[in-house]
């Protein structure tokens, strides 16, 4: 098959469905590519797991999928996983592997008040690399950090068809409600763009929401344009998870809205 007839196959990996925020930007920019999405719901949430477990589960899932669908690129659409899995993944795969990094640099450039909020998982806000990003790009800013698992759960419920509990959301963000000059918010978890409108309702003083999805989509395009492709011309976009879940039948009915044809359970334990 001529390489011009092939579409790049790109895998998005996350512990949940937060990576949809990254996937949708890629699909918007590159609508005809072949996309795979795997969420490790059996290991969710990664913010509560040890680094060794995150590395093991990510490697196992990605290797299993790559055996069936030779990948041209991989996106770790999870901030928590990106802090630990990129070196072992790059050692195991000879393809571009793109991580997700909180958009602290662009936030520091756009803020007018020099007061930034970093909203991420509990694991991410404590990582040393966050200290390094702030020291490198935002030394002249006050950077508030809020680590939350609750917002991840709220976003998961929204994507599965449930309404957002604004009372719980407002309560989780209450420590920032009185910060009138907090004008920029870094959405440091891929789940959070999925509930950006609801977050805005709770924090009306925030003018700028920064997250890396669009930049990641452009990076994928740059890395794979005009490259020799491994993947065959697969027709359908596929989704994988690692355990059955209560709303699975309802979730499957909504897959086509995101451009996927099927959901398959894979075992990685």
Curated annotation (Swiss-Prot):
Its EC number is 5.1.1.3. Keywords: Cell shape, Cell wall biogenesis/degradation, Isomerase, Peptidoglycan synthesis. Substrate binds at residues 14-15, 46-47, 79-80, 190-191. Disulfide bonds: none annotated. It is an enzyme of class 5 (isomerase). GO terms for molecular function: glutamate racemase activity. This is Glutamate racemase. It comes from Haemophilus influenzae (strain ATCC 51907 / DSM 11121 / KW20 / Rd). The lineage of its organism: Bacteria, Pseudomonadati, Pseudomonadota, Gammaproteobacteria, Pasteurellales.
């Amino acid at each position: 098959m001529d390489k011009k007839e092939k579409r790049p196959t790109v895998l998005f990996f996350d512990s949940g469905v937060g990576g949809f925020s990254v996937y949708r930007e890629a699909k918007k920019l590159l609508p005809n590519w072949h996309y795979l999405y795997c969420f490790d719901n059996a290991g969710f949430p990664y913010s509560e797991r040890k680094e060794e477990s995150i590395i093991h589960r990510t490697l196992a899932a990605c290797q299993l999928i790559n055996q069936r669908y030779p990948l041209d690129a991989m996106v770790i659409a999870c901030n928590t996983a990106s802090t630990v899995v990129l070196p072992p993944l790059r050692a195991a795969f000879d393809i571009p592997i793109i991580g997700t990094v909180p958009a602290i640099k662009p936030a520091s450039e756009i803020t007018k008040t020099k007061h930034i909020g970093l909203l991420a998982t509990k694991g991410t806000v404590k990582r040393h690399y966050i200290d390094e990003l702030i020291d490198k790009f935002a030394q002249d800013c006050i950077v508030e950090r809020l680590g939350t698992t609750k917002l991840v759960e709220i976003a998961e419920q929204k994507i599965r068809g449930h309404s957002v509990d604004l009372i719980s959301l407002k309560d989780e963000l209450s420590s920032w409600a009185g910060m009138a000059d907090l004008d920029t918010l870094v959405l440091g978890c891929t789940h959070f763009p999925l509930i950006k409108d609801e977050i805005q309702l709770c924090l009306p003083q925030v003018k700028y929401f920064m997250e890396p999805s669009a930049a990641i989509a452009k990076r994928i395009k740059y890395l794979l344009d005009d490259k020799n492709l491994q993947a065959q011309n697969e027709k359908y976009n596929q989704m994988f998870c690692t355990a059955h879940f209560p709303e699975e039948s309802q979730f499957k009915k909504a897959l086509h809205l995101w451009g996927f044809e099927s959901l398959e359970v894979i075992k990685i334990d």
